Amino acid sequence: MKKRIFAAFLAMTMALSLAACGASATEKKETEKATEQGSEKASDGASEKAEESKEEKKDASSGKGMKVGIVTDVGGVNDGSFNQSAWEGLQRAQKELGIEAKYLESKTDADYKPNIETFVDEDYDLIICIGYALADALKAESAANPDVKFAIVDDASLADVPNVTSLMFEQAQVSYLAGYVAGKTTKKNTVGIVLGMATDMMNQFGYGYTAGVLDANADAKVLQANANSFADTATGKTTANNMVTNGADVIFQVAGGTGLGVIDACKEAKIWAIGVDSDQSSIAPETILTSAMKRVDNAVFDVSKELVDGKVEGGVKTYTLADEGVDLAPGTENIDPAVVKEVDELKKKIVSGELKVPNNKADFEAKYGDVYDLDN
């Protein structure tokens, strides 16, 4: 009897033990399965993050290994004007595209060619020349180095050269708006304009500005001067002071570094100055009425991006009021609100083609007569 009871007890114990083992094995398998699934998910998540990180790095460094350099004109990289704007655009390209960026300053015209050659010798992928004054040097270097890509601001004389991209601007359009503001702002019916050089390119500023002044104020007189330099602040200041003596109470400087002297003279005389190329209000906030902006920074960034994308094809690229390649500075606190509204309407007319702004001698004189002297 005891044997039968013990046998039954033993059988029951073995059954319970087997059941427990079965449950333990099942739980172990389920635990292992869950762990594997979790590991797979974690692995997938890590892979996705790695891919995203890889893509981000790819986007940020798509220009890695590419070198872009700018050669300034004699105004230098701190001219507060288009050389500085060009460098700011290239710095943006360095940050956003991952390119290597560098500038070389030209102290005299004789520096243009050797500066370009320095970048060629250092195997730069794109060399950007800032200003029409570099055109002759670029012509020689682009011919001698057909495999190197070049760009130049404010010159289209090399438009047919396949490895040169010309970056042009409708500066007469924005100069017209600046002139209109000047004509509406002057209290003495006398305003001025100071050019760094009286070339065809620079005279486009003069035609637009003078046209804007006269359309705003038919009684206004426009004093005009050629400083004959983009890097002589003393001459800029003397020239502006002469205009102040002759009654000017608004002066538009289109003279690079020389123009800083113009602004200084206006500040001392407590009259208005109009800046050029970039927003120059930070130089003298209570003196700068507005600035005729030319977005050289955007042009330099754009051609750098085209290099990275493999789309630099040469030819001419022109920036206008329609694509905000030129415009007045955004700050309007020094301009009469009524004039701001009038300027906004003028912008629409220029963009639509209803208002044609003269950018050459023939078109200017056809409407306004022979009142612009710097083209003689």
Task: Describe each model-derived feature in a short phrase.
Residues 1-9:
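Positively charged n-region of N-terminal signal peptides that target proteins for export
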Residues 23-376:
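A residue-level marker of the well-folded mature domains of exported/periplasmic proteins
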Residues 17-20:
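C-terminal motif of bacterial Sec signal peptides marking the signal peptidase cleavage site
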Residues 4, 22-23:
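N-terminal helix-turn-helix DNA-binding module of bacterial transcription factors
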Residues 12-13:
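Repetitive helical segments and hydrophobic/amphipathic motifs
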